[in-house]
């Protein structure tokens, strides 16, 4: 079911599939150009108005972001072009159940805002590996998690976003793949490098608005074309391709006939493509890793003005996460109705003719809808939507990955690095990420086997659960120590890696040909595997922790839930190392009297290095630290966000029940 890679079944795309009318008219091109100009203008505005000259300013937007741009940024960071391609594609292939992945986030967003973020803020951290270092001490956990997170960024996030964006670019413009991707990444990087997190959050807000407007318009066109909701449900069940024989293959009807449970979210626990116990429990584990411990998501919450703003942002994002079912999954299913021969193709030679890959063209469901259904001008708007979702996800990944590298890895290599050096290192690392991303593209092209969204979720299921287990125990079980956490992560990672490599090597099979992967490794659905992996990791962490010395409470004040309200002074486990670093600090390598030329001034303006605030006294530093670790809320706003959280949970229960 989890569709990953099977190189043996992939045929390289000879060129973009033929579309009746590519984006070559003035209206479409004008819309795209205006879009890029506005995005760059917003990025430059954020660059000039915010303080990017400090690490906190560049990476956390100075903890001054209000709830609505933060909520929009959470949504935009999550919804990449991979969602438009992947959700619509899986919807076209198997119905609405894939939307449960989106709705599952409603609960986890509340867990993030009410339980995880308060601890992260009280801990005074910028990155998730940094939290583990404060909580457990030592360096190996921090370094290991930083490297693993960067690997996940490249192998999973950047790769799937670039692949899905490339589908649109090839269909719409007929451009050379590498030229188009290079241009996109270059523009994306410019405002990430120059603007920092504030720039990313404000451009995300703009792009969320563009995404929602464009998606609603396309949804309207799609439902009008198919004749309304009742007609849609009837026609989808009859969307069967006419060519079902060929290539000397005997193709089972189940490979090309819509599933009987296409309009149900809860599916059979054994035979279902998304079994209901896996959807409720396994999916929650993967979602807990993504929403509560992932750097890209948590970093947005750490930038919030106060806890009420953070909680309101989580609620706003939760409501927005209700929309993908109607904006992406159902339009993907309508695409199967309108373009059955292409989207639902089953004979390998026919699929190669339509989209260049033997195992199906469901990934092309949404792009086809855009290119064939939308009139001029609106087609350009929809391509802008795709570019918006691609670029917003990439900027979020670039900014968060550079934070991880700078704060968790670079500071280990260069212990006495000045703040200016850290800022430059973070920006240079973004450039390195872009190079790696472009080199990764050929590997991404192989990932066309089957359905992109199942590829994304299956890889997440193999890498995420051990991280979720460690963070959950770190916050809610103070008895857990460094040895338990480290070996729980390592053993969980090895188990997940074995399954992932096996699927890369053997493939996951398709309806036409079963995978040769050994049953003992690949026989369990990836959502069940995530659940097994989670509990194995928890058992290892607890067992080793109970067999070794506990961490004294004096090191844990405000780092775990039981001690979250402690007022005693915490002695950090890494305090000795911090003192050593501070002993080498305090010398600013910049000479304030130095005369600078025009080029140097322009460079400093571009990188946000010119705006140095006054040197803070010890008292001012303490006051700033208190602000950055403050989780207090005004009673009125606390009550308002709590009531809204209950309403959001009620809505989540209703939609699950209605589509069950």
UniProtKB/Swiss-Prot annotation:
| InterPro entries assigned to the protein according to its UniProt record, in alphabetical order | Na/Glc_symporter_sf, Na/solute_symporter, Na/solute_symporter_CS
Q: Which Pfam families match?
A: SSF
Q: According to its UniProt record, where is this protein mainly located?
A: membrane
Sorted alphabetically, which Gene3D superfamilies does this protein's record hold?
Sodium/glucose cotransporter
Activity modulation: Inhibited by phlorizin.
The organism's taxonomy opens as: Eukaryota, Metazoa, Chordata, Craniata, Vertebrata
Instruction: Kindly indicate whether the keyword Cytoplasm belongs to this entry.
Output: no
Catalytically driven reaction(s):
D-glucose(out) + 2 Na(+)(out) = D-glucose(in) + 2 Na(+)(in)
Q: What's this protein's name?
A: Solute carrier family 5 member 4
The region annotated as signal peptide is none
Q: What is stated as this protein's family in its record?
A: Belongs to the sodium:solute symporter (SSF) (TC 2.A.21) family.
**Record's GO cellular component terms:** plasma membrane
Q: Which residues lie on this side of the membrane: Extracellular?
A: 48-64, 127-171, 230-270, 335-423, 477-526
Q: Which residues lie on this side of the membrane: Cytoplasmic?
A: 1-28, 86-105, 192-208, 292-314, 444-455, 548-638
Alphabetized GO MF terms: D-glucose:sodium symporter activity; low-affinity D-glucose:sodium symporter activity
Locate the coiled-coil region(s) and give their ranges. Answer: none
Which PROSITE patterns does the entry link to?
NA_SOLUT_SYMP_1, NA_SOLUT_SYMP_2, NA_SOLUT_SYMP_3
Q: Which UniProt keywords apply?
A: Cell membrane, Glycoprotein, Ion transport, Membrane, Sodium, Sodium transport, Sugar transport, Symport, Transmembrane, Transmembrane helix, Transport
Extract one GO BP annotation from the record.
D-glucose transmembrane transport
Cell compartment(s), UniProt: Cell membrane
- What is the role of the protein in this entry? Low-affinity sodium/D-glucose symporter with a great selectivity for sugars (D-glucose >> D-galactose). Na(+) and D-glucose transport are tightly coupled at neutral pH, but at acidic pH, ion transport is uncoupled from sugar transport.
Glycan attachment residues as annotated in the record: 248
The transmembrane residues are 29-47, 65-85, 106-126, 172-191, 209-229, 271-291, 315-334, 424-443, 456-476, 527-547, 639-659
């Amino acid at each position: 079911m989890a569709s990953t890679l099977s190189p043996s079944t992939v045929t390289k795309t000879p060129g973009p599939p033929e579309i009746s009318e590519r984006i070559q008219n003035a209206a479409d091109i004008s819309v795209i150009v205006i879009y890029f100009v506005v995005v760059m203008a917003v990025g430059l505005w954020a660059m000039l108005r915010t303080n990017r000259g400090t690490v906190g300013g560049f990476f956390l937007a100075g903890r001054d972001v209000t709830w609505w741009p933060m909520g929009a940024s959470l949504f935009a960071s999550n919804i990449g072009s991979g969602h438009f391609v992947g959700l619509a594609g899986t919807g076209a292939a198997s119905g609405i159940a894939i939307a449960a992945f989106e709705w599952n986030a409603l609960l986890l967003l509340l867990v993030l805002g009410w339980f995880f973020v308060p601890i992260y803020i009280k801990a005074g951290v910028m990155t998730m590996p940094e939290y583990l270092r404060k909580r457990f001490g030592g360096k190996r956990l921090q370094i290991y998690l930083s490297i693993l997170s960067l690997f996940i960024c490249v192998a999973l996030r950047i790769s799937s976003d670039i692949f899905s964006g490339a589908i649109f670019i090839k269909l719409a413009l007929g451009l050379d793949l590498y030229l188009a991707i290079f241009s996109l990444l270059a523009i994306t990087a410019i405002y990430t490098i120059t603007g920092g997190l504030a720039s990313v959050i404000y451009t995300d807000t703009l792009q969320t608005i563009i995404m929602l407007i464009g998606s609603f318009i396309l949804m309207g066109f799609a439902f009008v074309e198919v004749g309304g909701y009742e007609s849609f449900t009837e026609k989808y069940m009859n969307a069967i391709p006419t060519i079902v024989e060929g290539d000397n293959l005997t193709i089972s009807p189940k490979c090309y006939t819509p599933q009987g449970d296409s309009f149900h979210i809860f599916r059979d626990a054994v035979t279902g493509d998304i079994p209901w116990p896996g959807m409720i429990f396994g999916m929650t584990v993967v979602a807990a890793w993504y929403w509560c411990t992932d750097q890209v998501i948590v970093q947005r919450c750490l930038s919030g003005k106060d806890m009420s703003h953070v909680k309101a942002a989580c609620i706003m994002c939760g409501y927005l996460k209700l929309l993908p079912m109607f904006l992406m999954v159902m339009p993907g299913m309508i695409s199967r109705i309108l373009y059955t021969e292409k989207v639902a193709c089953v004979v390998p030679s026919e699929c190669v003719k339509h989209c260049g890959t033997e195992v199906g063209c469901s990934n092309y469901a949404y792009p086809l809808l855009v290119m064939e259904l939308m009139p001029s001008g609106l087609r350009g708007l929809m391509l802008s939507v795709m570019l918006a979702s691609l670029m917003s996800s990439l900027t979020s990944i670039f900014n968060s990955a550079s934070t991880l590298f700078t704060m968790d890895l670079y500071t280990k290599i260069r212990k006495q690095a000045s703040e200016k050096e850290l800022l430059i290192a973070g920006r240079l690392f973004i450039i390195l990420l872009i190079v790696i991303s472009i080199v990764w593209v050929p590997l991404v092209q192989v990932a066309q086997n089957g359905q992109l969204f199942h590829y994304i979720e299956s890889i997440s299921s193999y890498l995420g659960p051990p991280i979720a287990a460690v963070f959950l125990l770190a916050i809610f079980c103070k008895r857990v120590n460094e040895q338990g956490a480290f070996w729980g992560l390592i053993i969980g990672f090895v188990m997940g890696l074995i399954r992932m490599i096996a699927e890369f090597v053997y493939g996951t099979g398709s309806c036409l040909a079963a995978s040769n992967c050994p049953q003992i490794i690949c026989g369990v659905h990836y959502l069940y595997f995530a659940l097994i992996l989670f509990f194995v990791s928890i058992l290892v962490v607890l067992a080793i922790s109970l067999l070794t010395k506990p961490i004294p409470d004096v090191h844990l004040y405000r780092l775990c839930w039981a001690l979250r309200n402690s007022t005693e002074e915490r002695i950090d486990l890494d305090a000795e190392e911090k003192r050593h670093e501070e002993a080498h600090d305090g010398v600013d390598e910049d000479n304030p009297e130095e005369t600078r030329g025009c080029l140097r001034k322009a460079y400093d303006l571009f990188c946000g290095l010119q705006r140095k605030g006054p040197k803070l006294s010890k008292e001012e530093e303490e006051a700033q630290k208190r602000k950055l670790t403050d989780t207090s809320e005004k009673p009125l706003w606390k009550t308002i966000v709590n009531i809204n959280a209950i309403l959001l949970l009620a809505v989540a229960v209703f939609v699950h029940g209605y589509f069950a």
